[in-house]
Amino acid sequence: MKKSIFITLLMIFICQSSIYAKNAEVAQKEAKYTIEQLFKEFSKEKNVTRVKLGGFAMSFADTKGVSGVEVYSFDECADNVKNNINTAIKNLDDSSYDTLVSTNEKGERTKVLVKIEKDFIKEIVVLTGGDDPALIKIKGKIKPEDVKKVVEYNQ
């Protein structure tokens, strides 16, 4: 009798643990991210390719107010990491940035966001989802007309 009660209690405990773990996983996937959280969390993933250029490196180029660039590429990461990034990009919620462009073509989601302060672009963030996700952040004190010149030059 004691053995039956013990086994029953053990089964109840296992079922509750399983339900809790599943709920925690669902909650994490549905979590809203800010830009900073997105970069901080996913920059630590295994096999991520990181490139950071700071002020010293930027001084060698005519960068039109750009003081730094960060690029994180996840094409070598595991599929579950890519899926988590794609979900995070989809659920992004950061009111301190304005959306410049948002596209979703054939499962590839791209968002271009800007943070503007006192008539200057302080940050440009490019988020790309899909099979080869990437996060790009460009920091500086950029005049909007300089961005327009670069776009026109590259057309």
Specify the residue positions occupied by each region the protein language model found.
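Localized chelating/binding microdomains
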Residues: 64-67, 121-122, 148-151
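Flexible, processing/modification-adjacent segments and terminal tails
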Residues: 20, 37-40, 146-149
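Mature, folded catalytic cores of secreted/periplasmic enzymes
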Residues: 19-29, 86-91, 127
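Early exported N-terminus immediately downstream of N-terminal targeting peptides
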Residues: 25-85
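Surface-exposed, polar helix/loop patches in the mature regions of secreted/periplasmic/lumenal proteins
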Residues: 87-146
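Short, low-complexity, Pro/Ser/Thr/Gly-rich segments in the mature regions of secreted, periplasmic
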Residues: 143-155
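Bacterial Sec-dependent N-terminal signal peptides
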Residues: 1-27
